[in-house]
A protein has these predicted regions:
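Conserved proline-anchored active-site loop of SAM-dependent methyltransferases
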Residues: 64-74, 192-197, 251-264, 278
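Short beta->alpha hinge that forms the Motif I/post-I loop of the SAM-binding pocket
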Residues: 98, 215-220, 266, 270, ...
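SAM-dependent Rossmann-like transferase core, predominantly class I methyltransferases
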Residues: 124-186
Length: 331
């Protein structure tokens, strides 16, 4: 599915330009950019692409920064601050996003940060703006984006931060899945798309041998590493895109609360990717435990990948599934 905002920005990704790329941008787009910072890990990232939580490299300045509006407000404000930091005086920020995605609010903040020199064009529900850095910057409030902060969850201390979906609360689906997997896990466990590590911590309370927590989000890896530090002797935290770099058939159990949005869009292909990777990674006699919104048709989507699909529970708009009997899927 083509993203109109990305298409508007592509002609500007050339020359002395820094691309700030979240999940909206493809690997190919990141590779084409001469300079890129992304908070989403992909396999085979070249040296020209920095994977981090939108942290500026030292002593670098650019004449242009290109940015597609992100979904989370704190990420937007962090990227605006980063763009202002990385631009030379009179350099330009080129930004695009949808009218229903918050682009108008973002442009108001950008004017406050960069100065009033802005050119905006309208494109069928989307806006493209070119903003010149005309003044010394005073950073806008990005909710202390770079800082981990403590969450108390039923007496347990966790750490999280902006840049993660639901970073300041426990997802209800994850709570339901934790109850479902109680006393069900052993051996090797994979938390696929671990977020800030809530499911991983629940798994570590059981009699398991090892746990791998993987995510493609830089903020998730920072938080999970902190949350799982007491169990470092049997935990591996992996920067990975949906298990692509992990060896097949190595996990007794996989636990997963998969995303069903990529940026602003609901992506069935993303759900299928998680299902297919789960089938590749789990052992022949292993189980995959999923929790999803009830409107996601897991039984139909998983039919191609698993012989057994057991609907365990429906509660508060979420479905818990136990998938087993993984099939060998053609590439």
């Amino acid at each position: 599915m083509t993203d109109p905002a990305i298409e508007l920005l592509k002609p500007f990704v050339c020359g002395d330009t820094l691309l700030l790329a979240d999940e909206h941008w493809s690997l190919e787009d990141c590779i084409k950019a001469k300079h890129c910072i992304t908070n989403r890990f992909r396999s085979a990232l070249p040296d020209s692409v920095l994977f981090n939580d939108f942290v500026a490299p030292q002593d670098e300045q650019y004449s242009r920064v290109v940015y597609r509006l992100s979904k989370e407000r704190a990420v937007v404000y962090r990227c605006l601050n980063l763009a202002a930091e990385m631009l030379s005086l009179n350099g330009q920020l080129v930004i695009a996003g949808g009218n229903k995605e918050g682009i108008k609010t973002a442009l108001k903040q950008a004017k406050q940060l960069f100065g009033p020199q802005i050119e905006t064009t309208l494109h069928s529900g989307y806006r493209l703006a070119i903003i010149s850095k005309a003044q010394a910057i005073t950073a806008i409030d990005d909710n202390n984006y770079t800082q981990l902060r403590e969450l108390n969850v039923k007496g347990q201390a966790f750490w999280s931060k902006p840049g993660l979906f639901g970073w300041d609360k426990v997802d209800r689906g994850s709570e339901i899945l934790v109850a479902a997997i109680d006393k069900q896990l052993d051996g090797s466990v994979l938390d696929l798309g671990c977020g800030w590590g809530f499911l991983s911590r629940a798994a570590l309370k059981q009699d398991i041998d090892s746990l791998t927590a993987s995510d493609n989000n830089a903020a998730a890896l920072i938080a999970t590493t902190k949350n799982l530090a007491p169990w470092a002797h049997k935990v591996t935290v992996v920067a990975d895109d949906c298990g692509e770099s992990l060896a097949a058939r190595q996990f007794n159990h996989i636990i997963c609360n998969p995303p069903f949005h990529q940026g602003f869009d609901h992506q069935t292909q993303l759900t299928e990717k998680f299902i297919n990777q789960s089938a590749r990674l789990v052992r022949r006699d292993g189980t995959v435990w999923w929790v999803v919104n009830q409107f996601v048709g897991v039984s139909q989507l998983a039919q191609r990948a698993f012989n057994q699909r057991d609907h365990i529970e429906r509660r508060d708009g979420f479905d818990v599934w136990r998938l087993s009997g993984p099939k060998d899927l053609a590439n």
